[in-house]
Amino acid sequence: MSSFRLGVSRVARQVRAPCVRNTRRYASDSHAPADHTHSAAGHGEHHHANAADANEELGTAFYVIFGAIPAFGALYYFSRPGKDGQPNSITKWLQKWEEHQEALADKNALVTAALEQAAHDKHLFYYVDQLRSGHYEMKYPEVFQHGSARNVPAGTYIPLDKVVEVYRKQHLDEEERKAKKLAAAN
């Protein structure tokens, strides 16, 4: 079987026509016009591109480094302590900002206290009758339970059924009083 294969491969090689080789193309021919003719001066002048200009710019990194040197020098100069142990310029500048922050915090505390006092006074004026009876209304009903109503483990919050019933009864009494007042006015 092996000899038969060798014989078949020899015959196939002999029968195969010899390959026609393509002519070799050069890179300089690919950009030449179709009607290109060689000049008497030879091949040297017309196929070569001009070299790039040698004037290259310095680039961003050069300017960053060139600017960083005086910046670090100035930082060093301003970070040095003053005469007789005085704080340096940067520390003085930061202390000015701290003073502004403290003044802003004091101002915010005063505004918050004024708003809380105004809310307290509003409750005093609105609920003066209830205060005489010893009952003081809440600032807002959600004060009982802050937080999300979802993903809460059982038993985390106190049951508010009695509180809800008190406010429901209060609302119904108020609506009944308004209905009687409207009926009396008609």
UniProtKB/Swiss-Prot annotation:
Q: Which Gene Ontology CC terms are recorded?
A: mitochondrial inner membrane
**Which reaction(s) does its UniProt entry say it catalyses?**
a ubiquinone + NADH + 5 H(+)(in) = a ubiquinol + NAD(+) + 4 H(+)(out)
Q: Give the keywords, sorted.
A: Membrane, Mitochondrion, Mitochondrion inner membrane, NAD, Oxidoreductase, Transit peptide, Translocase, Transmembrane, Transmembrane helix, Ubiquinone
Q: Where is the transit peptide?
A: 1-26
Q: What is its EC number?
A: 7.1.1.2
- Compositionally biased region (Basic and acidic residues): 26-49
Origin superkingdom: Eukaryota
Location within or outside the cell: Mitochondrion inner membrane
By its UniProt entry, which InterPro entries does this protein fall under?
Nuo17.8 (IPR034444)
Q: How does it sit in the membrane?
A: Single-pass membrane protein
Q: Which residues cross the membrane?
A: 58-78
- Which residue ranges does the record annotate as region Disordered? 22-49
- Can you provide one Gene Ontology molecular function annotated for this UniProt record? NADH dehydrogenase (ubiquinone) activity
Q: Subunit structure, per the record?
A: Complex I is composed of about 40 different subunits.
* Role played: Transfer of electrons from NADH to the respiratory chain. The immediate electron acceptor for the enzyme is believed to be ubiquinone.
Q: Give the protein name, as stated in the record.
A: NADH-ubiquinone oxidoreductase 17.8 kDa subunit, mitochondrial
